[in-house]
Amino acid sequence: MCIRDSSNGKPHKLRLYSIASTRHGDNFEGNTVSLCVRQLQYEKDGQTINGVCSTYLCDIKPGDKVKITGPVGKEMLLPEDEDANIVMLATGTGIAPMRAYLRRMFEPSEREKNNWNFKGKAWLFMGAPKSANLLYEEDLQRYLANYPDNFKYTKAISREQQNAKGGRMYIQDRVTESANELFNLIEDEKTHIYLCGLKGMEPGIDEAMTKAAHEKGLDWSELRPQLRKAGRWHVETY
């Protein structure tokens, strides 16, 4: 998305956003696209600074015209194999591509339109500070109820839950808790792992994966490049 600077008429840097809908759109007619946007705000020199593009998107009104480009890249595409297992690790608005995946897998109207009929296991690890920050919760609970054999949903709510050491519960703590089951899936060549959210989540996930792999007698520093080379490790952080 390209926005022009009102002070000099020149365009700002292009902003990339993950698409939160399938190619059929939320209305299943193929003429809409959905985004998941949180307005960026930060303090600088005693002033509150608003992010340029996120503020623009949050302030536009129904009927306003917006020029966009894309889609860009193939990093986060789902595999063609209907029997693939999909492990998703997300924080905040990083839920966007995961929402698109889960709609494609489990939304009834979407399944009717797809030649691709998901039969594998989907496991979403979602990190948020509070329960109120969890997005698309109603849809996720519906998928859990309708597809209990195919969908698992694990939440890490840092300000409401505690980890095993009594500290705040983060997504990497949930990964460590689920080490055995998670790496049983990863050892299956049909399993793909998708990571999306703030770049700061990567070190914690790597540390958790290292511990989890060790419990299975595996070396994560060797395994991760192998997964990447095989096209099974997908990362989109910002």
Placement of each model-derived feature along the sequence:
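FAD-binding FR-type
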Residues: 4-87, 103-113, 147, 158, ...
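N-terminal start-of-chain detector that recognizes signal peptides
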Residues: 5-8, 59-61, 92, 164-168, ...
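Generic amphipathic alpha-helical segments used as scaffolds and interaction surfaces in large
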Residues: 6, 10, 89, 127, ...
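Reductase modules of NAD(P)H-dependent flavoproteins
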Residues: 53, 64-75, 106-109, 113-238
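Ser/Thr-glycine-rich phosphate-binding loops at phosphate-binding pockets of nucleotides
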Residues: 90-96
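Phosphate-binding glycine-rich loops and their immediate beta-loop-alpha structural context
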Residues: 97, 102
